[in-house]
Amino acid sequence: TLGLSMMVVALAQARASGAVQGAMAATEATVEGPFFWPGAPEVPLGADIAEGVPGEPTLYMGRVTDVDGKPLAGALLDVWSGDGDGKYDVQLSAEPTMKARGRLRTDAEGRYWFWSIRPTYYPVPDDGPVGDMLRATNRNINRPGHIHLMVSAEGHVPLTTHIFVAGSPFIDEDV
């Protein structure tokens, strides 16, 4: 199930990227996951999107470029993560609080930076077929700490990816 989901994402990304000027995807795509929620607020560069969730304050920064390394000014990043206890806002209430979520645009050099928390590992929901499969294959149910980014820019194929916390438990066993 998990391998097939990732294969579908990889093939779709390759097909979509190839349709845009014969380009290859420079960053591997991943599944959106169950915790994405549309409508996060757009915030300025440097904002703190954590809004008081538990966890270690962390500055995230990077650069969005095209496949040739040219900066993508004005690219939109939709960011979301769990908190320092391994929970997403949508797991804690019926409606998302939009904490540890935000949308921001890159500057003229394609750079972005924002504050949030350093997310920790968490177990995937294992009460359905995914849990059955993980148990049957003797795989770990935990995901290492990570943040999600959905990146879109005019003339480019949207990309959903994630950035893992270095040294996070289970980093070598991600489901």
Predicted stretch roles:
Residues 5-175:
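Beta-strand-dominated extracellular/periplasmic modules and repeats
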